[in-house]
């Protein structure tokens, strides 16, 4: 895969599946695909995207600034504050040393990625802020390599936390994870599906899950809710049934 393709993949790995992720993917493919775009407008879109966390906004915003450093008229607080606000004084010092001594000598994406892998996330965040504030001191490949290494660490932490919740020893947590998964699936299919029958089905599923939450569901029944919803979606006429069966 190309340098930009790798970057898109790592950035998308940070976000949860859903309609917002599909919209973000379309934007990233446009920005990294070589099409001309206005940097300020792109940054405003990222800043106002509600489905993204502050860290995600900062990383995605920094990545497109690395694409067009000459068009960057001013530094954005929604990028600098999350990057500089994490960690201790010691980790920030490590990040500064990493940026000033090691990354300045790097010349390739993979070299920067391998060096960054050996550092903790808070140090990498501060290192990226230094790169963002001094774009002319580093090549685009080095900046994106450092960013992708951090994305891999962040995605790993997020997926471990999600798996931990899904395997929780508390039945109520597992049940709610199933319900959240079912609601997200219904909302996504409602937004992406074509035809009134698809949208009606998705709305009914959301309504039924809401009723179950209001009335309460037994531990045993609650755990099967998401599976039942998935089965209904698979059996319905929702356009590309092959994709539905593959991902649901």
From Swiss-Prot:
Using the UniProt annotation, give all residue ranges assigned to the region (RNP-binding).
165-248
**Which residue ranges are recorded for the region named Membrane-binding?**
1-164
- The molecule here is called Matrix protein 1
Q: Where is this motif: Nuclear localization signal?
A: 101-105
Record Gene3D superfamilies: 1.10.10.180, 1.20.91.10
Give the record's family classification.
Belongs to the influenza viruses Matrix protein M1 family.
Q: Which InterPro entries match?
A: Flu_matrix_M1, Flu_matrix_M1_C, Flu_matrix_M1_N, Flu_matrix_M1_N_sub1, Flu_matrix_M1_N_sub2, INFV_M1
Q: Which gene encodes it?
A: M
Q: What is the lineage of its organism?
A: Viruses, Riboviria, Orthornavirae, Negarnaviricota, Polyploviricotina
């Amino acid at each position: 895969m190309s340098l930009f393709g790798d970057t898109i993949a790592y950035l998308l790995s940070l976000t949860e599946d859903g309609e917002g992720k599909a919209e973000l993917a379309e934007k990233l493919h446009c920005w990294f695909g070589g099409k001309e775009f206005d940097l300020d407008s792109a940054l405003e879109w990222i800043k106002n995207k509600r489905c993204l966390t502050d860290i995600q906004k900062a990383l995605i915003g920094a990545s497109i600034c690395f694409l067009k450093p000459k068009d960057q008229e001013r530094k954005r607080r929604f990028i600098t504050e999350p990057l500089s606000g994490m960690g201790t004084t010691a980790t920030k010092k490590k990040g500064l040393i990493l940026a000033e001594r090691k990354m300045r000598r790097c010349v390739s994406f993979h070299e920067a990625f391998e060096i960054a892998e050996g550092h903790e996330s808070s140090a990498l965040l501060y290192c990226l802020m230094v790169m963002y504030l001094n774009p002319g001191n580093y090549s685009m490949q080095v900046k994106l390599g450092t960013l992708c290494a951090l994305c891999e660490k962040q995605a790993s932490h997020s997926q471990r936390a999600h798996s931990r919740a899904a395997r929780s020893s508390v039945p109520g947590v597992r049940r709610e994870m199933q319900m959240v998964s079912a609601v997200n699936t219904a909302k996504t299919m409602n937004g992406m599906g074509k035809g009134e029958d698809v949208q009606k089905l998705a709305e009914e599923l959301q309504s039924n899950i809401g009723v179950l939450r209001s009335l309460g569901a037994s531990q045993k029944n609650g755990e099967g809710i998401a599976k039942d919803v998935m089965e209904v979606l698979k059996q319905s006429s929702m356009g590309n049934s092959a994709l539905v069966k593959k991902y649901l």
